Structures are given as C-alpha cells and as structure tokens.
A protein has these predicted regions:
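Short, glycine/charged-enriched secondary-structure capping and boundary segments
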Residues: 58-60, 83-84, 123-126
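Hydrophobic alpha-helical scaffolding
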Residues: 79-86, 137-141
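Short secondary-structure boundary/hinge segments and terminal tails
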Residues: 54, 78-80, 173-175
Length: 177
C-alpha cells in the first residue's frame, strides 16, 4: 500500500552504473531512472552487493516517483556479527538510514542479499553443521542477531515508519520456529 492505495511493484535490480564510480555523471543517473520510468517500472532495488548510492540517485527517484527497495550492503556471505564488527555494522546502518530516511522514494529497508538463501538453499547450513555443529550454531545465531535483531532495531529507531525485510529472497524454511 502507498498512501492507502494498493500498489503492484514493477521493477528491477539496480547495480552500480560503473565499476569506476566517478565516471557516473548526473546525466547517466537520470537516464537510468528515466529508462525505468519509460519501461513502466515503479521500483528499483538497490542491490546489497553494490553501494549506498549517491544522493542524486535518490533525488531522481523522488522526482520521478520510483520507489526504492534499499538493501543494506551485505551480500552472499556470512559475517562475524559480534563485538567491534557488529558495532561497525550497526553504525554503518544508522548513518545510512539517517542519510536516506527523508527520501519519499525509500519504500523498504532490506537486511541483505541472499544470505538466508545461501544458508538454507545453497547448502551452507549442512556444510557447516557437518564440519562443526557448534560453529554452525554460532554462525546462525550471528545471522539472526544481525538481520532479525540489530538491523530492524536500527530501522525502527531511526526511520520508525519504514518497512523492514530481513533478506531477499526470503522464505521461512522452518528456521524461525
């Protein structure tokens, strides 16, 4: 729903425009956003394996009515979510939520790209359980702490009206019972 009206999201996964970021001009950003508009898209997902985009990207999405599914920059891996690294992750999330929260285009914050899928669907869980069950449990608990506790708390505290989704793709796989 958007402003009380049902919305069907039509969009694409957005990755950085160039591996050399300074080569991306404002005109290039505008072309990409207008290409989405002209393709009848209304949403772009900022991929968690990329970057938090420049303000011009979000300003153009605001201007042209493109909703943004904003991934946090965690992708296709497990991260030792404890101690100083977990605090660094938290601070990065706070900084980016605060920076982007006033953009009306931000429709959703998403914890990561494919980390749960990798754990359950790509066989990481079985692999780690076979190697060392205690280590597998530690990894899973850290994943839960990061994507189901810490990041949703950051979003709730810093952008309380925003939606949060733990991972993309996401299905329960029975793991949260």
């Amino acid at each position: 729903e958007l402003n009380g009206k049902p919305v069907f999201a039509k969009g694409a996964n957005y990755i950085p425009n160039d591996m050399f970021l300074p080569r991306v001009s404002n005109a290039k950003y505008e072309k990409v956003i207008l290409d989405a508009v002209n393709a009848n898209m209304n949403m772009l997902r900022v991929w968690g394996g990329g970057i938090y985009e420049n303000d011009i990207f979000y300003n153009l999405c605001d201007k042209y009515g493109i909703m943004v599914w904003q991934d946090f920059m965690f992708a296709c891996s497990v991260y030792p979510a404890e101690g100083a690294l977990l605090e660094n992750m938290r601070q990065e999330a706070i900084e980016n939520v605060r920076r982007l929260r006033n953009h009306p285009s931000i429709a959703l914050w998403c914890g990561n790209n494919e980390n749960n899928e990798a754990w359950f669907g790509w066989g990481w869980k079985k692999k780690y359980e076979k190697q060392n069950p205690k280590y597998a449990e530690l990894i899973w608990n850290q994943l839960v702490e990061q994507y189901h506790v810490m990041l949703p708390k950051v979003v709730k505290e810093n952008d309380p009206e925003a939606f949060y989704w733990p991972t993309s793709p996401f299905s329960e796989f029975g793991q949260l019972s």
